[in-house]
């Protein structure tokens, strides 16, 4: 269907190109062609995400109106660490972009019900049973409550917060975090609650990431102090570079990312604490590079750093999550080995890692679970945002089609909470193909694609039916929402592509003459009003103009 649509508009591109050459400076037909192709890819991404959202909404419990963790053995449970962390938030983000009625209606009501029904210790959530109409576990398990809260915040509410900003979901995130702060001393004894050390490291890694970001967002010193308390243990009190079990895939790699985020924060604040941490952090990262990778530069699932041995030699689908840490430390210290580590996997992606079994689950087929593909592709997109390598781009464009092929006609992917990761990565991919812009209101018959080239960005909006609305550009969300001085790579962030600077001036050229002119960034932030007739195509070229003041 999408290829047919592309071919249908190739002739239109040529006609449009001949027309717009008279109006645009040095326009390239290949860029317009790529922007239109990107529009088709983006629309497929968005359509699939909305199909996922509607399918899971159909599984809501009739009384609580919450979604289950999966459609099999946990059909009667809402779990903060699963339903809340993985599925629900990306239903919300899908609706925010594509269906505002759904966003302000059913999905907001779900948040209200989640808070009312699942809060167990203050605002801290616990597993809720639809059949019991109360908590699944009669006895309170503080360890599992802390785990569920940390997952819900970092994996679910934080990505929403970083994209949307101030909202009821941001409020929920902060109230849970502040109630976790009440139990700060219980974090010192997490190993009493969990058999696997990787679960403790996952929680602490999630907290380091959350606390570093919320510190910048709020300026509240207590969050930074808490993060330092956690990092002191790993980098000053024990030799974590000598740990006997380090998991480098999800549910373990978070600690490496968390330590790097705090390290970046200390660097940006010019605090001496950074240099106290530096030797231990370098030892950890250097040993991961030496003993934790295969010949292609991909990380093993788990390693023993005390014995310098590989425990699980399967390749981690979250390869980019760990590389985020290396890139972040490279940003602070310009340590060349860490940048080389980020670049190395690009060389073998297309030869050895297409149709790769990232997360083996034989009952699902030879490619395993879609969750592995979702994480692996997210890994690539976030790195591509920083290192725009053509080999990486080719691999992402290839493997997203493998991922898309795993969705059922119903909209369900595999029927468990990991389905949300499909939508997360699909949205991430689609927003790359629109350079972060979106249309409001969205409708299936109107597509937007974009491509950036040097200092210019081309947007092509193609309407099959009459449409009236706005073209909305992305903002520098790391600044406007998180107040971050640097946009370092973060797990589960939605990368920024073309972003407005509200203090800059932009020139717009277009085949719609009424749009041509100069605009202040603060005015463009409100969007560009558009009205398109059926079968009309609008091209908009946006370029930042020099500040002559």
Model-predicted regions and their roles:
Residues 24-548:
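Glycan-recognition and catalytic cores of secretory/periplasmic carbohydrate-active enzymes
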Residues 2-12:
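Sec-dependent signal peptide recognition
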């Amino acid at each position: 269907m999408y290829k047919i649509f592309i071919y249908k508009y190739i002739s239109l591109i040529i006609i449009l190109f001949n027309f717009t050459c008279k109006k645009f400076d040095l326009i390239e037909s290949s860029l317009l062609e790529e922007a239109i192709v990107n529009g088709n890819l983006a629309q497929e991404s968005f359509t699939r995400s909305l199909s996922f959202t509607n399918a899971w909404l159909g599984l809501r419990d009739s009384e609580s109106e919450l979604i289950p963790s999966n459609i099999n053995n946990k059909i009667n449970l809402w779990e903060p660490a699963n339903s809340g962390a993985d599925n629900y938030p990306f239903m919300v983000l899908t609706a925010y972009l594509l269906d505002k009625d759904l966003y302000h209606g059913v999905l907001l009501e779900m948040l209200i019900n989640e808070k009312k029904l699942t809060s167990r210790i203050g605002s801290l959530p616990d597993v809720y049973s639809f059949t019991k109409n109360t908590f699944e576990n009669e006895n309170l398990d503080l360890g599992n409550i802390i785990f569920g809260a940390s997952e819900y915040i970092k994996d679910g509410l934080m990505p929403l917060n970083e994209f949307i900003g101030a909202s009821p979901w941001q409020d929920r995130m902060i109230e849970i975090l502040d109630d976790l702060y009440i139990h700060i001393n219980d974090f010192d004894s997490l190993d009493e609650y969990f058999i696997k050390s990787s679960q403790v490291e996952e929680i602490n890694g999630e907290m380091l990431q959350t606390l570093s970001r919320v510190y910048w967002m709020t300026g509240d010193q207590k969050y930074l102090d808490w993060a330092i308390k956690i990092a002191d243990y790993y980098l000053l009190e024990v030799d974590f570079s000598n740990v006997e079990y380090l998991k480098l895939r999800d549910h373990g790699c978070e600690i490496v990312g968390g330590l790097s985020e705090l390290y970046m924060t200390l660097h940006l604040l010019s605090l001496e604490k950074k240099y106290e941490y530096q030797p231990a952090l370098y030892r950890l990262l250097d040993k991961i590079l030496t003993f934790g990778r295969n010949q292609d530069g991909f990380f093993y699932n788990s390693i023993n750093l005390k014995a310098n041995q590989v425990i699980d030699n399967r390749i981690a689908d979250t390869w980019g999550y760990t590389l985020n840490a290396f890139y972040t430390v490279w940003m602070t210290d310009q340590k060349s080995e860490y940048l080389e580590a980020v670049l190395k996997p690009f060389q073998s992606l297309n030869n050895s890692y297409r149709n790769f079994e990232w997360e083996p689950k034989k009952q699902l087929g030879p490619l395993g679970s879609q969750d592995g593909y979702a994480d692996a592709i997210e890994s690539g997109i976030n790195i591509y945002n920083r290192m725009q390598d053509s080999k990486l781009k080719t691999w992402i464009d290839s493997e997203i089609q493998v991922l898309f092929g795993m969705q059922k006609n119903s909209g369900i992917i595999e029927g468990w909470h990991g389905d949300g990761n499909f939508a997360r990565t699909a949205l991430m991919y689609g927003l790359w193909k629109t350079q972060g812009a979106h249309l409001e209101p969205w409708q299936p018959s109107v597509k937007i694609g974009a491509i950036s080239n040097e200092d210019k960005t081309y947007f092509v909006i193609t309407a099959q039916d009459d449409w009236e609305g706005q073209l909305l550009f992305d903002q520098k969300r790391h600044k406007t929402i998180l107040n971050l001085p640097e946009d370092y790579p973060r797990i589960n962030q939605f990368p920024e592509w073309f972003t407005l600077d509200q203090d800059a001036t932009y020139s717009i050229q277009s085949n719609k003459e009424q749009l041509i002119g100069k605009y202040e960034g603060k005015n463009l932030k409100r969007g560009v009003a558009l009205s398109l007739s059926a079968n009309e195509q609008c091209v908009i070229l946006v370029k930042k103009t020099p500040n002559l003041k």
